[in-house]
Amino acid sequence: MTNVLFDLISLQDYRSGGGEYVKKVFDELLLCNSINIYGVYDSELLFIDNDFDEFSKQIEMFDIRKMKLSNIINVCKIDILFIGIIQRYNPYDLNNIYCKVICVMHDIGDIEITQNNIHFMYKHTIKNYIKLTIDYWNEKSKYSTKNRVLKQYGNIRQFLGKANVSLYTVSNYSSSSILYFFPELKVKNITVLYPPPKSYIRCDNIDDVTIQNLFSSGKRYLLFVNANRDNKNFNVLNKCIDKVVSNFPNMYIVVTGLNMQVETKNVIALGYVSNSDMENLYQKAWALIYASYTEGFGYPPIESLKYSVPVITSNVCSMPEILSNAVLYFSPFYENDLFFKIVQLHKEYQYYQ
C-alpha cells in the first residue's frame, strides 16, 4: 500500500482551472485500491461549498497550521507528496521533506504579466499608482513589481531544485516559460501532461433565476467568464461593447464574476454560477470570448468547443498550442481586432460550429 499525502490547499479559497485539475486527480486516486490517501489543508483558508465535509468523509485530513508538512509526512509514513499548484505552497515550510514529491506548476502568469509590463494596463487604485511609478522609473529596484513577484518564488525555486522533487506542467508553452525564467531547472526533466477533461454533469434544471430568464427569452449572447480576474482581460471587451451592441442590437453579453459597473443595457452580469449552470451557459452561448493575457492551458475554450460553440480567443501563450485552428484568434491588446473577429464570426458562423 502506497501512502500519498494529497494537496487540498489548492482546492480552497477560490475556483480555478488549476483547482479543477487537482480535483480530477483526487477523484481518480480515490478509485485506486493500492493507495492510501491523506489530505493536507489550511484552516485559515475557506473550503468551497461543502468540500470540507465531503473530503473528511473520504480521507484523514491534517491542518498545515497545526503540523508542518515534514511532520505529517513522518507521522503518516508518506511515500509520495502530491502538490497540485506549487505556488499555493509559497507561504509554508518546505524544509526536511525527503519523500518523493510530485509538483504541478500550471503556469507562471504573474511573472509573465509583470516582466512584460502588462500590469500597467490593469485598472489601478491611487495606492497602486505609487507602485507603478517605481516600476516605470526604476524597474531594477528591489521594490519594483517585477522583482517583488520574482522574489515570491524564492522558496519554491529552492524546493523544486531538490532531487526528490519531480515537476509537471500542463502545456509545452508553460514548460518553455518556466525554463526561460528559471533556467536552473533545466537539469529537471519537466513532464508535460495536458489536463484531463472536466466531469461536471449538466442538469436541465437551472439554479440561477437570471439564467433561467435568459434561456427562456431565447436571446443570443456572447459569454465571458471570470471577469473579476485581471489577467482574463475583460477590459478589451468592455472597450468595444458599445460597438458590438450597436452593430448587433439583439446580441447580449453574459459576464461571470463581473465586479465593475457596465452601463451598456445588453450586458448581463452574473456572480457565482453553479457548475451545472456554467455548463448550460457554455452550451447555449452564441460564442465564447476568451481574452486572456496569460494562460498555461485554458479550460473555458475546451468547454465551449465540446458543445460546438465557436470561440474567439487571444492569440498568446498556450492558446495556439491547445486550440490550433479550431477557433478565431485576436490580439488581446487591440479592441478593434476583437470587434473585427466578432463581425467575421457573424458572417462565417457555420464554419466555426
What do these predicted regions represent?
Residues M1-Q353:
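Carbohydrate transferase catalytic cores enriched for Leloir-type hexosyltransferases
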